[in-house]
């Protein structure tokens, strides 16, 4: 919860809430195991690949790390790999790991477009462009983007439509009271 995040700032979730961490980790492990059983190549975030500068990235704005929910930091829509711009600066460290996984794929297939959303201002202005992967659900050429005021911003929805072009229709879905669409 938000109050606990403020009092325990910078501490690993394993220390602050071991039961929650264990449950999330177990769920991720189960999903990975199931996908591997279906011959899906599963890539997991490994924070150990980050160098010291990457680990310290934006620490002066928000302490901590969040390597449990990598989908919030990027999304794949068709042949578009999109680095997101999240409201929580600590999530931006994920992009360094994801780049190491996805960038080589763009070299293998020139039809893949690798796009990075503009990085938000560290002063958190209301009109900043935020786009979060956990707010995005794709159904063919229809892209649904949750808008709660806690994640993706209206300007993020507009930016996504401009990046995807006329081949996709982006719908903004009001999800007040929820954190993310998925």
Where are these regions (language model features)?
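The feature marks the mature, well-folded catalytic cores of soluble enzymes
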Residues: 1-182
């Amino acid at each position: 919860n938000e109050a606990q995040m403020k009092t325990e700032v910078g501490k690993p979730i394993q220390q602050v809430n071991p039961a929650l961490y264990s449950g999330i980790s177990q769920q991720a492990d189960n999903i990975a195991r199931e996908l591997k059983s279906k011959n899906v190549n599963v890539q997991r975030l490994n924070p150990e690949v980050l160098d010291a500068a990457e680990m310290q990235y934006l620490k002066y704005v928000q302490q901590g790390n969040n390597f449990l929910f990598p989908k919030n930091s990027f999304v794949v829509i068709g042949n578009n790999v999109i680095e997101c711009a999240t409201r929580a600066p600590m999530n931006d460290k994920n992009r360094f790991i994801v780049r190491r996984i996805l960038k080589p794929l763009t070299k293998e297939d020139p039809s893949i477009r690798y796009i990075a959303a503009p990085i938000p201002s560290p002063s958190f202005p209301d009109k900043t462009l935020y786009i979060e992967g956990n707010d995005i659900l794709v159904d063919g050429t229809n892209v649904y983007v949750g808008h709660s005021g806690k994640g993706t911003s209206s300007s993020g929805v507009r930016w996504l439509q401009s990046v995807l072009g006329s081949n996709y229709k982006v719908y903004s879905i009001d999800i007040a009271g929820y954190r993310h669409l998925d």
